[in-house]
C-alpha cells in the first residue's frame, strides 16, 4: 500500500519498522464539549485504516490520547460550577470522555490499544522537561513557566514546509512576557489561582499541549514508531512542535515514519466550528442516521480532501447501507439454494480486485466504497437471480469476500440477528411460501405486511423468497 506522507509530501510505500506490526498514534480530543461529526471523520478514517492493516495480517497498536486538562476545560468548569470549579473541574473531561466512548461504539470504531490521559502522565512530562532544560533546549521564565526554544532546533518547520524566518516575520514583534522568541512554546505553564496544578521543580503548574502528545506516544509505542495522525489543522503548530521536542530529546530527525492527516469538514464551504455556529454533534447525527451511514458518508470523500457535510449525503449513505444489508441477508439465505456445480460464470471478482486496488492507492475510500456498493447491487441484481446456476462453493466465496470488504469499511456491524427472531421469521416465510403455492395470495400478503411492520422485508425471486432486516427497528 502507498500512503501520502505529509513529512515528505509524497506517496510512499507503507513499510513498518517491525514486520507485521503497525504502531500508530492519533491525537485525541480535548474533552470540554460534545464530539462532533468532524471528530468522527478523523477517528473513523483511522479505524478503517487499522481494519485494513489487520485484514492484511498486521497487529495494530493504535494509541489515542485525551488532553484532559486544558484552558478550555477550566473555562467550561467555571461556566458550570462557578466557585466550585477548582474542586469539580474533573467532572467536565470525565463526562465528555464517556460520551466519546459512547459515540465511538455507535460508529463501530474498534477500541484502541491504549487511551492515555495527560493527568495520568504528568510525572513523565516533568522528567522530559528537566532533560530538555539540561540539554539547553528549554529555559525558565521569571514566573516559573518553562519554554521550548525553537531556534535551537535545526530545520524547524520541516513538516509544515515553513522557514523559521518566515514564521518570525508573521509573529508578533515583541514576544510574550517571559519568552525569548515569539515562536517559543510552553512546556510547563505556571499556576494561576483557582486553576488545577501539579508540583514541579520550577513552580506549581501544568504541562503544555505540544509536550503531552510526544511523551504519551513514545511511552506506549517506542521510538521511532510507524505513523502519527490527526486532523490537518494539527500540522502546525502542534505536530511541528512535537517533532521539534522529539528531535531535541531523542536526537532523531523524525520520531514517526509517516505523518497522516485528515482534511477538514465543511458546511456550505466553511470549516465546521463552534465560532460559526455550524457544528453538528455526533449524538445529533446518530439520532437520525445509523453508524454505517456516517461511515459510508465519510468514506465517500478522500481522507486528505475537505469533506462537505450535508444531510443529503447522509440520506444517500443510509440508502446505501440498507442495500448493503439486503445483499448480505439474502445471499446468506440463498447459499442453500445454490447448485452442485457452476453452470454459469459470474463476473464478481472485478469488484473485489478494484476495491483492494483503491485502498492500496493512498487509501482511496471513495473508489473502494463504490466498488463495494457495486458488488452489493450485483449480488441483488444478478447473483440472487442465478443462484441455482452457481455452486454452493462459489456462493460462499462471494459471501466471504463481501463480508471481508464490509469489515474493512465497518459497515456490516449489526449483521447478527437474535436466534429466536431468525427462527420466527424463517417459520413465517415458510408458511407464506405454502400459501403462495396454494394461491392464497390474500393471506400471503397479510404475512408480508405483518413482517414489514416489524422491520422484515420480503423479496420474491420466482418461487424463492429471501428476507432482510431493517436495522435500528425494534427487532434490535
From Swiss-Prot:
Motif ('HIGH' region): 29-39
E.C. no: 6.1.1.16
Binding site for Zn(2+): 27, 213, 238, 242
The keyword Transmembrane helix is assigned to this record: no
Binding residues for ATP: 274
CC cofactor note: Binds 1 zinc ion per subunit.
A Pfam family recorded for this sequence: tRNA-synt_1e
Short sequence motif named 'KMSKS' region, residue ranges: 271-275
Cofactor(s) in the UniProt record: Zn(2+)
UniProt keyword annotations, A-Z: Aminoacyl-tRNA synthetase, ATP-binding, Cytoplasm, Ligase, Metal-binding, Nucleotide-binding, Protein biosynthesis, Zinc
GO molecular function: ATP binding; cysteine-tRNA ligase activity; zinc ion binding
Reactions catalysed according to its record: tRNA(Cys) + L-cysteine + ATP = L-cysteinyl-tRNA(Cys) + AMP + diphosphate
Superkingdom of the source species: Archaea
Gene Ontology biological process terms from the UniProt entry: cysteinyl-tRNA aminoacylation
Keyword Aminoacyl-tRNA synthetase: yes
Subcellular location: Cytoplasm
GO CC annotations on file: cytoplasm
Family of this protein: Belongs to the class-I aminoacyl-tRNA synthetase family.
Protein's name according to its UniProt entry: Cysteine--tRNA ligase
Gene designation: cysS
